[in-house]
């Protein structure tokens, strides 16, 4: 592991668990029956603790949509052609995608990152980072998807995005992805890190039929078999290099960077969760700072959450990616902060306690 990445990991500190009773005491003193705001109260307490006991704040918030292409697309694991990755990056920059609408609705700053797309460089744009580590990955079913150097560079790119956001005063982050065929490396990563089977968690992605899902599961299994020694070796960065993607590694770095900067981060759907799982394998403490935003409609997501022992905030049947679930989660995180900060106490409101 590079010295720079090691230094970043050393900067990640666990939250102070002793602050949770402080948060609970405050929430219990607000003008409502205790616990009546349910998971919003749990979320408010987490945000208070992440902030080190200061008033919880998530504004301004920013979502990074990280894009990359995948060599495994050559195996026919997606209904969409690979050029859609570039086309959707252009759509994000033009403001026409689902994440553009939801981010604008929630008042969230949106940035787009080329971590590993194919083709010519994109034209400059004020909300775009042309930080390409490589032009796509290799086919994980035939070779390591990335070199170790490429993987660490993508991780450090994500870290740098978090650090830049923190330096600009951003108080919370969200993850988003774009990359045709990226549910395949994500599935492989879940299998490698969590001990799940391809048959159990491989899903349709952008709409494969049952036969397509079966072929996709076989490709995942082939990749896992090819890289079995690396998986067994237990080096999480090596696993990410063999089975992941450039945008996935970038998002994993974003999660690590958020934790190093003590920023809460809303984790989007299937691909972003794979990045989170990779980040957690590399640096388990990142779990203190991550909010799993929603239950992906991918059929493998339930066993993934069971393996992690986590429960997403929302279950809306989403399976788009792009950061759409993260945008909704950040709105809930803002709501939780406002509950904590702005509700009256029983004493201040002159309300009798039950």
Swiss-Prot record:
InterPro entries with a match to the protein in the record: Nict_dMeBzImd_PRibTrfase (IPR003200), Nict_dMeBzImd_PRibTrfase_bact (IPR017846), Nict_dMeBzImd_PRibTrfase_N (IPR023195), Nict_dMeBzImd_PRibTrfase_sf (IPR036087)
Reactions performed catalytically: 5,6-dimethylbenzimidazole + nicotinate beta-D-ribonucleotide = alpha-ribazole 5'-phosphate + nicotinate + H(+)
EC number: 2.4.2.21
Listed pathway(s): Nucleoside biosynthesis; alpha-ribazole biosynthesis; alpha-ribazole from 5,6-dimethylbenzimidazole: step 1/2
Active site residues according to the UniProt entry: 322
Alphabetically ordered keywords of this record: Cobalamin biosynthesis, Glycosyltransferase, Transferase
GO biological process entries: cobalamin biosynthetic process
UniProt keyword Zinc, yes or no: no
Pfam family, one: DBI_PRT
SUPFAM superfamilies associated with the record: Nicotinate mononucleotide:5,6-dimethylbenzimidazole phosphoribosyltransferase (CobT)
Molecular functions (GO terms): nicotinate-nucleotide-dimethylbenzimidazole phosphoribosyltransferase activity
Biological function: Catalyzes the synthesis of alpha-ribazole-5'-phosphate from nicotinate mononucleotide (NAMN) and 5,6-dimethylbenzimidazole (DMB).
NCBIfam families: cobT_DBIPRT (TIGR03160), PRK00105.1 (NF000996)
Recorded family membership: Belongs to the CobT family.
Protein name: Nicotinate-nucleotide--dimethylbenzimidazole phosphoribosyltransferase
Organism: Solidesulfovibrio magneticus (strain ATCC 700980 / DSM 13731 / RS-1)
């Amino acid at each position: 592991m590079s010295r720079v990445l090691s230094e970043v990991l050393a900067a990640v500190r666990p939250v102070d668990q002793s602050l949770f009773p402080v948060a609970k005491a405050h929430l219990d003193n607000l003008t409502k029956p205790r616990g009546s705001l349910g998971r919003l109260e749990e979320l408010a307490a987490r945000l208070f603790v992440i902030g080190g006991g200061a008033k919880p704040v998530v504004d301004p918030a920013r979502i990074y949509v990280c894009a990359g292409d995948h060599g495994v697309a050559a195996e026919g694991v997606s209904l969409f052609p690979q050029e859609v990755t570039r086309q959707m990056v252009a759509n994000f920059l033009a403001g026409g995608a689902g994440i553009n609408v939801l981010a604008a609705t929630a008042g969230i700053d949106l940035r787009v990152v080329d971590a590993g797309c194919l083709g010519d460089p994109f034209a400059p744009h004020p909300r775009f980072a042309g930080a390409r580590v490589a032009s796509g990955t290799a086919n994980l079913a035939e070779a390591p998807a990335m070199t170790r150097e490429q993987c660490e560079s993508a991780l450090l790119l994500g870290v740098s995005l978090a650090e830049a956001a923190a330096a600009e005063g951003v108080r919370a982050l969200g993850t988003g992805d774009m990359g045709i065929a990226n549910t395949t490396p994500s599935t492989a990563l879940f299998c490698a890190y969590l001990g799940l089977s391809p048959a159990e968690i491989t899903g349709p992605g952008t709409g494969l039929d049952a036969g397509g899902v079966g072929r996709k599961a076989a490709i995942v299994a082939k990749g896992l078999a090819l890289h079995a020694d690396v998986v067994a070796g237990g080096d999480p960065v090596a696993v990410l290099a063999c089975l992941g993607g450039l945008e996935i590694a970038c998002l994993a770095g974003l999660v690590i960077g958020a934790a190093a900067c003590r920023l809460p981060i809303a984790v989007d759907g299937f691909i972003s969760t794979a990045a989170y799982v990779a980040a957690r394998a590399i640096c388990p403490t990142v779990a203190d700072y991550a909010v799993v935003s929603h239950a992906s409609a991918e059929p493998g997501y339930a066993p993934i959450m069971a393996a992690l022992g986590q429960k997403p905030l929302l279950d809306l049947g989403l399976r788009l990616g792009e950061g759409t679930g993260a945008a909704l989660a950040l709105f809930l995180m803002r709501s939780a902060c406002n509950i904590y900060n702005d509700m009256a106490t029983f004493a201040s409101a002159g309300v009798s306690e039950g």
